[in-house]
Amino acid sequence: MLPAVGSADEEEDPAEEDCPELVPIETTQSEEEEKSGLGAKIPVTIITGYLGAGKTTLLNYILTEQHSKRVAVILNEFGEGSALEKSLAVSQGGELYEEWLELRNGCLCCSVKDSGLRAIENLMQKKGKFDYILLETTGLADPGAVASMFWVDAELGSDIYLDGIITIVDSKYGLKHLTEEKPDGLINEATRQVALADAILINKTDLVPEEDVKKLRTTIRSINGLGQILETQRSRVDLSNVLDLHAFDSLSGISLQKKLQHVPGTQPHLDQSIVTITFEVPGNAKEEHLNMFIQNLLWEKNVRNKDNHCMEVIRLKGLVSIKDKSQQVIVQGVHELYDLEETPVSWKDDTERTNRLVLLGRNLDKDILKQLFIATVTETEKQWTTRFQEDQVCT
């Protein structure tokens, strides 16, 4: 059973619980967008964070800024007494009959009562009326599970793409949430949200001493060594830092090369065990061996550290050199799903090919993972498979 989140002191202004009051914004459409019409893919940004951290405030800010985007908002379960919920038609059984509410500025709001796929599929029928989707999760939601559905559903994949995951952390209560111990060795929700994020907003920095913000920032960086950390007040942020990140597609490979060179390895924060590890291995990887390496980590979960603890990878990102391919290949992994995609960047003839990986997760051992990765590059498939024994599978 999950503990109650927050106390009376943590309760957000009632307005935080309501759907943002949207105001008209001027929108323009380029000739290229008009030509592409319904054929253009629509980016989705997942906004996550604990109750009261400022998710709805960020939504309100994004929707009222002058960004020339027509935005659809998906609220993952409305709060009790939500002003928007009163405007939705409800069936006699108490379930939503009409899921969508179209607002005067062209934006859309909906309540997702199921896994979210049906709602987004319905939203696709309104494609052409908007060009960006913001999906706000509940406070305890695992954004990885939400992110995964965009890779699973092939039909959705042709219409939309996951742009990035934004996690908002409350400056006052964030450290408490991140260090909360869970039973049976489970990872607490706040820590998982931070680990999966492409950008982390430390919000309400004006309400706490600078030293507290510094401690929180250090803790966040110890969990996620790759994501950008931004300090905000009232969730106000340069929109280029949260929208159009291309964090999950091949375009991210262009900036990822430089970023991976400066990712710091981290130590577990306090008594927790989530870390960021990074390593580089020169040479080419055989694609089938690379798949085996990733699958043993994400699917079989049969890789253990020196203390014989199972390694759990929450997020995986990297650039690799695949044998017989001229393009750099980006590797993305969330939960049990992963993808290899060629980037627009080619390997130069006068530079050494190399593989850089960043893994975020629990009980990770850099030395063991690096040696296993080297095995994917240098060993035969027969030799490689002997490294994993059935009786070593983690349960």
UniProtKB/Swiss-Prot annotation:
A motif (psi-PxLVp motif) lies at residues 17-24. Residues 8-20 have a biased composition (Acidic residues). Its EC number is 3.6.5.-. Keywords: Chaperone, GTP-binding, Hydrolase, Metal-binding, Nucleotide-binding, Nucleus, Zinc. GO terms for cellular component: cytoplasm; nucleus. Zn(2+) binds at C107, C109, C110. A motif (CXCC motif) lies at residues 107-110. Pfam families: cobW, CobW_C. It catalyses: GTP + H2O = GDP + phosphate + H(+). Ubiquitously expressed. Up-regulated in cultured astrocytes treated with dopamine. Residues 1-22 are annotated as: Disordered. One of its GO terms (biological process) is kidney development. It is an enzyme of class 3 (hydrolase). It is linked to Congenital anomalies of the kidney and urinary tract (CAKUT). A disorder encompassing a broad spectrum of renal and urinary tract malformations that include renal agenesis, kidney hypodysplasia, multicystic kidney dysplasia, duplex collecting system, posterior urethral valves and ureter abnormalities. Congenital anomalies of kidney and urinary tract are the commonest cause of chronic kidney disease in children. Disease susceptibility may be associated with variants affecting the gene represented in this entry. This is Zinc-regulated GTPase metalloprotein activator 1A. It comes from Homo sapiens (Human). The gene is ZNG1A.
